[in-house]
Amino acid sequence: MVHNESDTFDIGGDLTVRRLGFGAMRITGEGIIGEPDDVANARAVLERAVELGVDFIDTADSYGPGVSERLIGETLDTEREDLIIGTKGGLLRNTDADWLPHGDPDYLHNALLCSRDRLRMDPIDLYQYHRPDPDTPFEDAVHALAEMKDEGLVRHVGLSNVSVEQLEQAQDIVEIATVQNQYNVANRDDEDVLAACENYDVGFIPWFPLAAGELDDVDGIDEIAERHDATRYQIALAWLLQHSDVTLPIPGTSSVDHLEQNVAASAIDLSEDELARLS
């Protein structure tokens, strides 16, 4: 029987989650805009994730926009103590489906209140600044998140798409619980950010963890997958889980079958030789 076998990490020191989570971007419509074609299926994916032992779900107000958060709030008991939900604010969507950074402190505060209502959570477990806005001083946006934490609106603060320098700047303002950057077995440009997270005991949430379409150049991945009777994507997830103790992969999908395949990857034990070859 498939179940989340990943070990645990304490987000912010007190929110214990299994390290393989679920990213809820794909439960929206095409292009991450609007309602999903099959709302019942989207709800089934969320419910099945929890049944499989996934207790960390990541979303954002820009997914839909608002659709992913609302479906989570309507489908799951978001106040249960054994389910941790992180969301993000600071990206807008336009009619062309562009992703537009917006870090104005007043906007972030209002966005948080809207996320809280959609998710039906008070406080929100983890609130992450989605992407630094070149038109807003980074420190101003982080101070806004610090105020949210001081006011009891959020339990922990995270960052996304940041550098080591920005992480350290933010740490001087408020305790940072997580960083969410692109990282996978095929793309390790942010290895320095991962190392900093390990140093500070900050959770590292690698987005695009499956590296779909980018695995052809990863030496040995198909051979290793065949050895474990697994898919190359399951090996990519297993590698992330074993590469560092602070990684919290959040593979997303709109399919229950794919969800179960992703969760099954948590039981794969790569050998030292296999890890070295993939690395």
Predicted regions and their residues:
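A short acidic, helix-capping loop that chelates divalent metal ions and anchors anionic groups
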Residues: T28-I32, L92-W99, L215-D216, H258-Q261
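Active-site groove signature of glycoside hydrolases
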Residues: R116-P134
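N-terminal binding-site loop/beta-alpha segment at the start of enzyme catalytic domains
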Residues: M1-L83
